[in-house]
Regions:
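Conserved helicase/translocase motor-coupling segment
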Residues: 1-65
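Generic serine detector
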Residues: 2, 36, 46, 58, ...
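General structural signal for secondary-structure boundaries
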Residues: 11-17, 47, 73, 123-126, ...
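Short runs of predominantly hydrophobic/aromatic residues within well-ordered alpha helices
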Residues: 14, 64-68, 135, 169
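Generic alpha-helical secondary structure signal
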Residues: 28-29, 74, 177
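Activity-critical C-terminal alpha-helical subdomain
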Residues: 36-130
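Charge-biased C-terminal accessory regions appended to nucleic-acid-, cytoskeletal NTPase
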Residues: 90-183
Length: 183
């Protein structure tokens, strides 16, 4: 993996992102002729969306609407909040986090865990907006309670345990590892 390079596609519709990525890849190939690549897209339900075929090694698609949907894990939020908040706010923040997830019906179904949960709600909800962007998002609710609590996406991800990371993410990194070993 020491020869990996990552480039963000900066959002937009999937077709435009792929076209920009293709141009970038063609330019890189002029410098490194044997370069390999892998493109990773959010799941798109629009009529113009394309979805990579299962055997495609260079195109990967999350099975959830936004990458933030993989951060819908209350315990990871609580651990992250405990790292940055004053001790006197910890219980209150934890309760607010639990209430948020319960209020949004984003709780684990019986006999499921975060790694294998398949409930459709985790795929289709707009995690980007409800967790971070909306005025009443979890991020903003917690920050209003304690201004020191600025839980960025990376902080939540770093607070996740291996068993809380969904199988989609494990699968992506396995594909990335396989690609790097083939290069």
């Amino acid at each position: 993996m020491s020869k990996m390079c990552f480039k963000t596609m900066h959002g937009g519709n999937k077709k435009a992102m792929k076209e920009r990525a293709d141009r970038h890849y063609e330019a890189v190939k002029l410098i490194i002729p044997n370069v390999s690549r892998m493109l990773l897209f959010d799941y798109d339900r629009s009529d113009e969306a394309f979805h990579p075929l299962p055997g495609n090694t260079s195109l990967v698609e999350w099975q959830r609407k936004n990458i933030e949907n993989y951060l819908l894990v209350p315990d990871a939020w609580k651990r992250a909040a405990n790292q940055v908040s004053a001790p006197q706010f910890a219980d209150d923040l934890g309760q607010r986090i639990e209430e948020f997830f319960a209020g949004e019906n984003l709780t684990l179904p019986p006999n499921k865990n975060w790694r294998n949960v398949t409930a459709n709600v985790f795929c289709v909800v707009d995690g980007k907006r409800i967790l971070f962007e909306n005025d009443d998002s979890l991020f903003h609710r917690l920050r209003k309670r304690d201004p020191a609590v600025q839980l960025l996406r990376e902080k939540i991800a770093h607070s996740m345990l291996a068993e809380e990371i969904h199988e989609d993410v494990h699968h992506f990194f396995q594909k990335l590892k396989t690609l790097s070993e083939a290069s």
